[in-house]
């Protein structure tokens, strides 16, 4: 079994392998059994990370003109929705050359702006290269091979992934740039954000609606924003703005809870609490600038949550939220080198929308 570990906050976490590695391994094993017979229990492949990995082979099916087998997706300690699913490859002999197809459970790209052309199976460029390299090393020079990748549970699993948001229908994507799944990978999440921004821009969305998570998305929908314009950016608002600026997007809407929004008002564009937590300081500062009594400022400063502050302040100091929203708008404009104008919508769980700046 493949074993590779990374250190994350002092914890030893096990890596896994990508759906791309699974597809390449299954394709290589099926091709070898098709041309040279026998039944393999495991197969070794090269991955872009620069190492070899050996993975178990299962569900072997030998037909008159094909061999089909699978690799079980292993995600290590990463909380990956695809962990444990079977990635199948079917190898068939053809007269010459190489052909790659997507079967049941592999998504089909239905929009522009992704790594794969519209109408093609959602098998990303690096996995495509991996599959071709591994199988063509085995196929005799005067022969050819057709590979079909399929994922029986792919359509069901895809509903819980980014694919519906990316206009990929019918299944999951075969992904991976290194061949390895790194637990809690920040890079993987940021890549998903960038991909969604680019895809939506290519499909005609020129004013994206950025939200931090599902709660913000639900609020934005209730306010009448178009769901197709929404992009979940998690803690990476700064990174998302960088991608928007690269695409020369001039206007966005940002809908978020006061807790996250206060951090941006103070210039924090990575909003994870471990990186930045100035929520109460932000509200307290604005209250002080409004000449609120010291005991009010001090009480808010020492509170644990922004929801508690909203409840405590009631409506008497509601101007504070407008001031914070205006600062967020200004911060975004400055952060993007005076290129992106933002509509700001800030809400609390208790009161709903507490500030809106166009």
Swiss-Prot record:
S-adenosyl-L-methionine as UniProt keyword: yes
GO biological-process terms attached to the record: anaerobic cobalamin biosynthetic process; methylation
GO MF annotations in UniProt: cobalt-precorrin-5B C1-methyltransferase activity
Catalytic reactions of this protein: Co-precorrin-5B + S-adenosyl-L-methionine = Co-precorrin-6A + S-adenosyl-L-homocysteine
Keywords: Cobalamin biosynthesis, Methyltransferase, S-adenosyl-L-methionine, Transferase
Organism superkingdom: Bacteria
EC number from the UniProt entry: 2.1.1.195
A Pfam family it matches: CbiD
Metabolic or biological pathway: Cofactor biosynthesis; adenosylcobalamin biosynthesis; cob(II)yrinate a,c-diamide from sirohydrochlorin (anaerobic route): step 6/10
Similarity field: Belongs to the CbiD family.
Alphabetized HAMAP family for the sequence: CbiD (MF_00787)
Name of the protein described by the UniProt record: Cobalt-precorrin-5B C(1)-methyltransferase
Organism (species): Clostridium novyi (strain NT)
